[in-house]
């Protein structure tokens, strides 16, 4: 499989912090060289304290969001407790692997906070699942994003600093990757809440980094 077929047009990042996680993406969607959308959603809420970023086919990604959201809610209704981050990642991994001969053209980050603390898992189109203990990036702009993440990540980073790191990584990727652009969507998940940052706050933080 040619990775370029499903990594085009996206940069998403995940940062594991001491008090939660940060998920972020830019909002450009492309069809070849055509900019199809400037407000594409690539960070989704799939449970109270769990989010997922998507890189790749929009249709495949939206189907997977619906699937995992429903399964997560059904689990909660049956067990009277939320599924763990690892459990959700395993569920998604199994589904992707079962469809490996007709693969979903996606690359995902699933992250949040559960009874075991903050965690992020990265998944490929074949269902391979890796727990990311620090940082992760997906999509065509990920090499540029990793340059910032690897250079500036600290083991004791808090969400407040993780926010700026994620924004800086996406911003840096947008400078060099023509398929990534427009605004930046940022989600912060702590043990208290799932919070999507207001666009004005993101813009203010982004401007202060220049």
UniProtKB/Swiss-Prot annotation:
Localization terms from the record: Cytoplasm
EC nos: 3.4.25.1
Keywords, comma-separated and alphabetical: Autocatalytic cleavage, Cytoplasm, Hydrolase, Protease, Proteasome, Threonine protease, Zymogen
Protein name per UniProt: Proteasome subunit beta
Keyword Hydrolase attributed: yes
Protein source organism: Methanosarcina acetivorans (strain ATCC 35395 / DSM 2834 / JCM 12185 / C2A)
PROSITE patterns per record: PROTEASOME_BETA_1, PROTEASOME_BETA_2
GO molecular function, one term: endopeptidase activity
Subunit structure, as described in the record: The 20S proteasome core is composed of 14 alpha and 14 beta subunits that assemble into four stacked heptameric rings, resulting in a barrel-shaped structure. The two inner rings, each composed of seven catalytic beta subunits, are sandwiched by two outer rings, each composed of seven alpha subunits. The catalytic chamber with the active sites is on the inside of the barrel. Has a gated structure, the ends of the cylinder being occluded by the N-termini of the alpha-subunits. Is capped at one or both ends by the proteasome regulatory ATPase, PAN.
């Amino acid at each position: 499989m040619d990775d370029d077929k499903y990594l085009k047009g996206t940069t998403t990042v995940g940062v594991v912090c001491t008090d939660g996680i940060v998920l972020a993406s830019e909002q450009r969607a492309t069809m070849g060289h055509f900019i199809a959308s400037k407000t594409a959603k690539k960070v989704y809420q799939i449970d109270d304290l769990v989010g997922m970023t998507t890189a790749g086919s929009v249709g495949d990604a939206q189907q997977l969001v619906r699937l995992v959201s429903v399964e997560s809610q059904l689990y909660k209704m049956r067990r009277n407790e939320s599924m763990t981050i690892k459990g959700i990642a395993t569920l998604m991994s199994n589904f992707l692997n079962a469809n490996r001969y007709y693969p979903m053209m996606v690359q995902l980050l699933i992250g949040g906070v559960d009874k075991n603390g903050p965690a992020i898992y990265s998944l490929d189109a074949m269902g391979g699942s890796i727990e990311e203990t620090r940082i992760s990036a997906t999509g065509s702009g990920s090499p540029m994003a990793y340059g910032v993440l690897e250079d500036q990540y600290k083991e004791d980073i808090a969400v407040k600093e993780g926010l700026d790191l994620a924004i800086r990584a996406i911003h840096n990727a947008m400078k060099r990757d023509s398929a990534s652009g427009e605004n930046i969507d940022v989600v912060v998940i702590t043990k208290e809440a799932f919070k999507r940052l207001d666009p004005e706050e993101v813009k203010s933080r982004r401007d202060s980094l220049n």
